[in-house]
Amino acid sequence: MKYSVGITALLATLAQGAAVMSKRDIPLDVKIQVVNNSEVKASITNSGSSSIKVVKTGSILDSADVEKSVIMAGENKVAFDGIRYQVATAGLPAEAFQIIEAGETIEVSFNVASTHDFAQGGDFDIAALGTFSVAESDSGDIFSAMAFESNHIKAHIDGTEAAKVRRSYLAKRTMVQSDCTGTRLTQTTNAINSCRSLAQRAASAAQSNSAKMNEYFKSTSSSAVNTVVTTFNRIASECNPSGGASRQYCTDQIGACSPGVIAYTVPSQSIMVNCPTFFTMPTTSNACRAQTQDNTILHEVTHLSQVKGTQDYNCYGYTCMRQLTSAQNLNHADTYTLFAQAIKVGC
């Protein structure tokens, strides 16, 4: 994607909606530095007077290869080629959380060469940008979200060394035959078929229900409507158990089913994986904002480059979705998911 601005302007645009996401003053400060060519070290400091319980899953604290940074080569954003999640918003296990005590600093490291192509090498601008989902100390349910933006740094990356890291990462992606059998096959097939119905209803509603378009996508412009309709039509085409561009798996393929993850997608490989939590969920639901098997499939399908190539922004659930900008909503997997569920239920 071509940008006419550098990283500072890009991050300002992305953060415009994210900045209002914090309903409380949650004092987490993120700083990054680059070491060993393409390794990023991040420190997250709680400068407040009380502990904060944040969701690790899908965030900069996650050990999996989720999107943790924005990288620019001049005016071009370097494409992210890692994992996109669907994360549960309620009933998360203790392992999904990180408690950051008052005054404590948590340090994490990740290698951006694993999920970005730096083969040509050169100078890059890097910053960490995202959200932390927050829960009460005695709860496994997400109740708010906090946006963060780190310092911006310039780094010179050796393409040859970065390519070695990337080759090692790609070698871990071992493709196997589909393992969806028995009840898991039945559940997955039913969910895919139901996903198609969800998408078809949503595509129709996007053209006629301006109130819902405003509520979820914050726009009723012809451009926004066209984007939403096109995306849902592509979802409907992809939600086909015997066709489509993606491969569906019922067991973890790359070790990414961490606590709280319902399913994940590797867009560059057109792989979608349903994690164990997926198979404990209902196929569908008449609850307004329920997480179900069918809308999980819909969520993951939007991540496919053939459909929309959406992002998560580590923003899950209605409360967080409402605080994004229109531009973010139009490229946000859970916005499409929540819209489709609302249209189905009529809420």
Curated annotation (Swiss-Prot):
Disulfide bonds: C180-C250, C257-C275
GO molecular function: metal ion binding; metalloendopeptidase activity
GO cellular component, one term: extracellular region
Metal-binding as UniProt keyword: yes
Residue numbers binding Zn(2+): H299, H303
Co-factor remark: Binds 1 zinc ion per subunit.
Cofactor(s) needed for function: Zn(2+)
EC number: 3.4.24.39
Database matches in Gene3D superfamilies: 2.60.40.2970, Collagenase (Catalytic Domain) (3.40.390.10)
Superkingdom to which the source organism belongs: Eukaryota
Keywords: Cleavage on pair of basic residues, Disulfide bond, Hydrolase, Metal-binding, Metalloprotease, Protease, Secreted, Signal, Zinc, Zymogen
Active-site residues, record numbering mapped to chain: E300
One of the GO biological process terms: proteolysis
Family membership noted in the UniProt record: Belongs to the peptidase M35 family.
Protein name as catalogued: Neutral protease 2 homolog MGG_10927
Organism classification: Eukaryota, Fungi, Dikarya, Ascomycota, Pezizomycotina
